Amino acid sequence: MVKGTPGIVNLEGPVSERLPNRDHLLLWNAPAALAELSGLNVRIAGIANNHSLDAGAVGAEQTIEALRNHGILPAGGTAGAAVLEFNGLVIAVTAHDLTQGVPVNLEADLAAARQHSAVLIATFHITGPASFLPRPKLRHAVEIAYHAGANVIVAHGTHALGPVERRPHAVIAWGLGNVAFACDCTQEEDAMILRVVVGSDKVVSAEALPLRAGLNNRPARPSPEAAAIFDLLEAIGSSPLQRKGTSAFF
């Protein structure tokens, strides 16, 4: 991340201690991880995903409180939209889980978030086998977000990359992969960071930065195969890329 620039992540699972009597806890984040995220200037964490209730409803509420105590705004679930003011712009960030389908209240949620913000960032969590191509329900949700005025639309959850796309008032990243993930459920190492510069109701620039995901306690690194990642993105239907070494603008 650029120093001083706020970061947005999906936090997969609750913040919780692993206790002997909580065998049902499938995926969780150690409380100490929040200080690390805060140190990286992560300002917003989406908490709407298929593991958000792994510590139960109480665990989900405790996660919201823990994030706020570390200066990180939660987005999604009972927290609703996160609203951040940065460089004079009011930025709203929403997070929705599509595991059970497109939420019936999605359009209303996005309209409410857009009403009082200069920039709307809509994020979606989608589950299923790793695939470079977006699933129908993700396409449906993205179209709703675009027509609701979202300027940046991002999907995550299948552990796989997806195309990047530029439209008149928005950019779309159809799949980011993972930055860091300690789970035997995936071995997908290709990932990317989306870096955007925004103005009021517009995206000034959008840049894809390929990563090698930090899986199972290995650190995330810039991808040594950035050119191959760009080839892949173009092959699966991305908007034209302007390559600049290890990053590409679109």
Question: Where would I find each of the regions flagged by the language model?
Answer:
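Acidic, metal/ion-coordinating pockets
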Residues: 1-250
